[in-house]
């Protein structure tokens, strides 16, 4: 499946809501000028996606949206790669929650979980079982019961930003791998006391960048015994 946006013809959008989506040769996203290529996963029940999703070049092309509300979308293969980096992966938006499991690696310029303008009492989640390359933003909306939780089992190359839009600590990043992990990038709070950082990996996690700052400290830091 190839989606190609075009300056003259406009955007290319594909909505997929079947229980099983199989793209034997993968899904290719091609942004051309102002024409954007976007694939939306909108499963009405739990959804499994078989096949890679890539851009046509290294210039950050294409958008992947997970908009299936409480239904979990599981991606069996890699999304993006060094030479075919995706522009954006969005899990949920302002009106629909998103919950995703990524079995392979994910490479995108930006990976966004949740939405700052959401007013729904929704739970946004992402389970990354491979390596992640790209900047990750975890953003809860204006409802106090809204949560954005991400678990990382592999290495992360990019910055992680935790943003609680209400007083509760609702944006939580957990590192739960079974082998040693490395985070190449910062872990930052948008405002002071935003977010929670958890380490449950008993093999250890090395953070090579700054975690929080004197003016915008992380709201909660938890390290499990033997981690």
What does each of the following model-derived ranges do?
Residues 219:
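UBL (ubiquitin/ubiquitin-like) substrate-recognition surfaces
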Residues 133-136, 157-159:
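Short, solvent-exposed S/T- and G/P-enriched segments that are highly enriched in secreted/extracellular
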Residues 1-22, 28-48, 56-82, 90-105, ...:
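Extracellular beta-strand-rich, repetitive "passenger/adhesive" scaffolds
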